[in-house]
């Protein structure tokens, strides 16, 4: 009986270790974030690191009744990519990807509208540093200001 209990305990420990490794694999990338949400402001220049779990928590906390709410993520390592979100409703998101040339914004962005589940799945891929752009249907937009 004791050996069966030990085997079961080891299986549970192995399963937990495997899950922790999965979280670790996407958790510690060189990604920073910036946001504005009512009384909480984090400036892009501060280069505050973030992991996927914290990112989803911050996104869930965005108050869509605040017209200035937004959150953005910059991958400072491998991809150099950036993605930004504005929460427009409980399950409604505006997403944008600035188009850069030689590290400078061209005044063009890719924009899309989606739901929480799709945006979260896309963000997971962003943090895993695998192709994520195809998760949403994008349109190009030019900013004139």
Give, region by region, the residue ranges found by the protein language model:
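Acidic, proline/glycine-rich low-complexity IDRs
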Residues: 3-52, 62-68, 76-82, 86-145
């Amino acid at each position: 009986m004791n050996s069966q209990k030990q085997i079961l305990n080891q299986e549970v420990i192995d399963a937990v270790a495997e899950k922790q490794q999965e979280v670790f694999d996407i958790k510690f990338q060189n990604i920073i974030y910036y946001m504005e949400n009512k009384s909480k402001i984090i400036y892009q220049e501060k280069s505050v690191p973030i992991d996927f779990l914290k990112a989803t928590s911050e996104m869930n906390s965005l108050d869509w009744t605040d017209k200035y709410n937004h959150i953005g993520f910059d991958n400072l390592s491998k991809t150099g990519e950036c993605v930004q979100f504005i929460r427009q409703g409980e399950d409604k998101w505006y997403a944008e990807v600035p188009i850069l040339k030689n590290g400078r914004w061209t005044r063009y962005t890719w924009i899309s509208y989606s739901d929480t589940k799709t945006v979260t799945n896309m963000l997971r891929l962003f943090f895993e540093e695998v192709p994520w752009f195809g998760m949403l249907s994008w349109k190009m937009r030019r900013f004139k200001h």
